[in-house]
Amino acid sequence: VINGVINSLIIATCTAVLSIYFSAMTAYSIHVYDFKGKKFIFNFILLIMTIPTQVSALGFFSMCTDWGLRDTYIPLIVPAIAAPAVFFFMIQYMKSSLPIDIIEAARIDGSGEFRTFNTIVLPMLKPALAVQAIFSFVASWNNYFLPSLIIDTSTKKTMPIMIAQLRSADFLKFDMGQVYMFIFI
């Protein structure tokens, strides 16, 4: 049980932190810069959001097998960094509360782009970052589909897989009290 909590905590924390940072950076670049193909890239990211995970699962599984990434946490964390839903909410928040004038003032003062993003933009996005971190953490914590495909070792399994194994261990002698206590922990 403790291994499942720790494994889920590691995966969910890494996913939440990395997805909100890189999604905010992507949203910042599309919101602030004017470049050719900006609208196409924005629409492409939104289009990706409509594709369910299950559609690409077979190719993803075979790629993880070929690259030797099965039974590791990398295939559970790295693809979650490119979170189109988090990107969409971040860019919507930026459109409503991030004035371009502040960014231009930072550029005039000699601030580089990464410094501007990390020291000026991110603190202004704290409410959106907090909300999206919670959403990303919960979504990653509750993810059952990909960990059940990728993780084989019992010591690396996450909480949803352990709960499912507990529920289906013996379907004739099924103790819901034990399952609910396990979920509570």
Where are these regions (language model features)?
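A structural signal for multi-pass alpha-helical bundles of membrane permease subunits
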Residues: 1-185
